[in-house]
């Protein structure tokens, strides 16, 4: 008994290495078991909320102690954020849950100026962070010890499919000449634009996740949490206006032909979704395997158009941020961005608007994307992204459980 107790204490105090494990993110060849310790100070006598606005965790990565600083992503949800699903007889059910006390965070690693983090703290810590130039994933382990987490490098996750994955947008536009060079675009937060996004989840996704709507919503929330961080450097603020789950059946003809699905989705958005939810852009998340290597498709330079401010994204990976980057890529097309060429750069990393998803996880938009996005905004002046949406943390929200049933 004493020997068992000593072993347990040692495991709780020190991380240990594992050679191979199957996690939610996939098969991992090399991982580290860690026990993140929350060190956020709480004033004496104060009641500690479930999710603070700011938190700090100590953990060990590669045997070295690090401090993870997290701040709640307060602008993640729009004021009138809604969730819609469908009953077995096809009735539309819409709720307006209170989301100001949510569990999604951005952050950084202490003493690493180039570090970033996008973390869900809903059930343990789950997400990704960049440390000393390398991307790491963290997720809770399903052990009797609920504090145990796995930390592993992105490169140590076995690839689900070695075939290249691409965006279906082709370079068939007219010759493009930007109005300014990057050095001439001296933008600041006075130029900020605001995109309110609705993510629609098809019936195949509902089946793929075994009808677990909460798990689907958490998947989408974490995706948008990552997208918001990527767009922050572009002076584009992303907020989630709604999640709609086609829990009964698909409301459009979802096909492996991505262009057909995109056209169908855009038409449905114009005649249906826009009349129910105020938003600027809609993205369809589907379990359908698109033809060929395509994992996403969107119209170019169409933000604010009733039909064309849309994209379709295949749920192509168990790693959340890879699907999030794909959705950020497709929305980038809506904002006028083209695919990066060899002359484009984003600080030595793989860029979000690369036409091919590389093994080096994309993190940033390139200098080309920056110019193209703001060239589109300055020339076309899309009106719907000018207004700053009210945030859920600054206004009252409908009472939990408010529900609308529609025939």
From Swiss-Prot:
Q: Which residues form the Peptidase M12B domain?
A: 193-389
Q: Which domain of life is it from?
A: Eukaryota
Q: Name one GO cellular component term.
A: plasma membrane
What post-translational modification information does the record give? Contains sialic acid terminally alpha(2-6)-linked to galactose in a complex N-glycan chain.
- Record SUPFAM superfamilies: Metalloproteases ('zincins'), catalytic domain
Where expressed (tissue)? Expressed by the venom gland.
Q: Which Pfam families match?
A: Pep_M12B_propep, Reprolysin
Attached carbohydrates are found at 367
Entry binding sites for Zn(2+): 329, 333, 339
Which segments are removed on maturation as propeptide? 21-187
Listed CDD domains: ZnMc_adamalysin_II_like (cd04269)
Q: Which positions does UniProt annotate for Ca(2+) binding?
A: 196, 280, 384, 387
Q: Does the keyword Transit peptide apply?
A: no
- Annotated GO biological process: proteolysis
User: Cofactor note, please?
Assistant: Binds 1 zinc ion per subunit.
Write out the catalytic residues in the record: 330
InterPro entries, alphabetized: MetalloPept_cat_dom_sf, Peptidase_M12B, Peptidase_M12B_N, Reprolysin_adamalysin
Please state the Enzyme Commission number of this protein: 3.4.24.-
A GO molecular-function descriptor: metalloendopeptidase activity
Q: Which PANTHER family match?
A: ADAM A DISINTEGRIN AND METALLOPROTEASE DOMAIN, DISINTEGRIN AND METALLOPROTEINASE DOMAIN-CONTAINING PROTEIN 28
- Say which family it is in: Belongs to the venom metalloproteinase (M12B) family. P-I subfamily.
Role played: This zinc hemorrhagic metalloproteinase has fibrino(geno)lytic activities. It causes hemorrhage and has myonecrotic activity on both fiber types I and II. The recombinant enzyme, without post-translational modifications, also has proteolytic activity, but does not show any hemorrhagic activity.
Record protein name field = Snake venom metalloproteinase ACLH
The organism encoding this protein is Agkistrodon contortrix laticinctus (Broad-banded copperhead)
High-level lineage: Eukaryota, Metazoa, Chordata, Craniata, Vertebrata
């Amino acid at each position: 008994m004493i020997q068992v107790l000593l072993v347990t204490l040692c495991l709780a105090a020190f991380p240990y290495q594992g050679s191979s494990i199957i996690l939610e993110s996939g098969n991992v060849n090399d991982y580290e078991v860690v026990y993140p310790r929350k060190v956020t100070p709480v004033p004496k006598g104060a009641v500690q909320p479930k999710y603070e606005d700011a938190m700090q965790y100590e953990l060990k990565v590669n045997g070295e102690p690090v401090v993870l600083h997290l701040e709640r992503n307060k602008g993640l949800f729009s004021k009138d954020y809604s969730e819609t699903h469908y009953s077995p007889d096809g009735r539309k059910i819409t709720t307006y849950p209170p989301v100001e006390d949510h569990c999604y965070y951005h952050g950084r690693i202490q003493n690493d100026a180039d570090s970033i983090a996008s973390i869900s703290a809903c059930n343990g810590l789950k997400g990704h962070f960049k440390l000393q130039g390398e991307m790491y994933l963290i997720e809770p382990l399903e052990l009797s010890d609920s504090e145990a987490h796995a930390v592993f490098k992105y490169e140590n996750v076995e690839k689900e499919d070695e075939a290249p994955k691409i965006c279906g947008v082709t370079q068939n536009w007219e010759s493009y000449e930007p109005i300014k060079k990057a050095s001439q675009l001296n933008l600041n937060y006075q130029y900020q634009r605001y995109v309110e996004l609705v993510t629609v989840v098809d019936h195949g996704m509902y089946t793929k996740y075994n009808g677990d709507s909460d798990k689907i919503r958490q998947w989408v929330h974490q995706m948008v949490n990552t997208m918001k961080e990527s767009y922050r450097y572009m002076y584009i603020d992303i907020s989630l206006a709604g999640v709609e789950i086609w829990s009964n059946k698909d409301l459009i003809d979802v096909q492996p032909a991505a262009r057909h699905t995109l056209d169908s989705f855009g038409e449905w958005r114009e005649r249906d979704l826009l009349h129910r939810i105020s938003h600027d852009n809609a993205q369809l998340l589907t379990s359908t395997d698109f033809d060929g290597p395509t994992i996403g498709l969107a119209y170019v330079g169409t933000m604010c158009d009733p039909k064309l401010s849309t994209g379709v994204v295949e749920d192509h990976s168990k790693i959340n941020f890879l699907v999030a980057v794909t959705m950020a890529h497709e929305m980038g097309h809506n904002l006028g961005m083209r695919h990066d060429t060899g002359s484009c750069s984003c600080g030595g990393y793989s860029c979000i608007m690369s036409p091919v998803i590389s093994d080096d996880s994309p993190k940033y938009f390139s200098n080309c994307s920056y110019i193209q996005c703001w060239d589109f905004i300055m020339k076309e002046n899309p009106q719907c992204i000018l207004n700053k949406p009210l945030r859920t943390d600054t206004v009252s929200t409908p009472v939990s459980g408010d529900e609308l049933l529609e025939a």
